[in-house]
Amino acid sequence: MTKLREFYRCETCGNIVEVVHEGAPSLVCCGKPMIKLEAKTEDQGQEKHVPVIEGADNGFTVKVGSIEHPMVDEHYIEFIEILLKDKVLRKELRPGQVPEAKFCESKSDIIEVREHCSVHGLWKNK
């Protein structure tokens, strides 16, 4: 059973979807069940992947990793997403951009911060 805000990936074509209406027993793409992505918080390479929140209560910046993540065609951060009490905000990134996002929200409303690396998958910080 899918749940709200879960991510799934197609192993055939690479499509990634986020559940906005929960309840489907499974998600299918390219004729095969999609794989649920589990967000990592620690692992080899965490210094380049775990989102870091910086800033005050009236706005903040999310940087990817304590060491800046590469942003090249074959290895980059695809998006940074924050889950707040009543909404979700996402910044999509491209190779060559700085792996960070600025948000004008209250830091105290953050439930979770996530990012997706094109090579190493989904990472989070609470």
Residues covered by each model-derived region:
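Exposed aromatic-hydrophobic patches
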Residues: 63-64, 99-106
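Short Cys/His-rich "knuckle" micro-motifs
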Residues: 19-23, 37-40, 125-126
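Short acidic/polar inter-strand loop motif in beta-rich domains
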Residues: 118-125
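Short amphipathic, basic-aromatic surface patches that mediate peripheral association
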Residues: 64-72
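Residues immediately within or flanking Cys/His clusters that coordinate Zn2+
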Residues: 7, 16, 26, 114
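Short cysteine-rich clusters marking metal-coordination/redox-active sites
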Residues: 10-13, 29, 117
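Intrinsically disordered, low-complexity linker/tail regions enriched in polar/charged residues
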Residues: 1-12
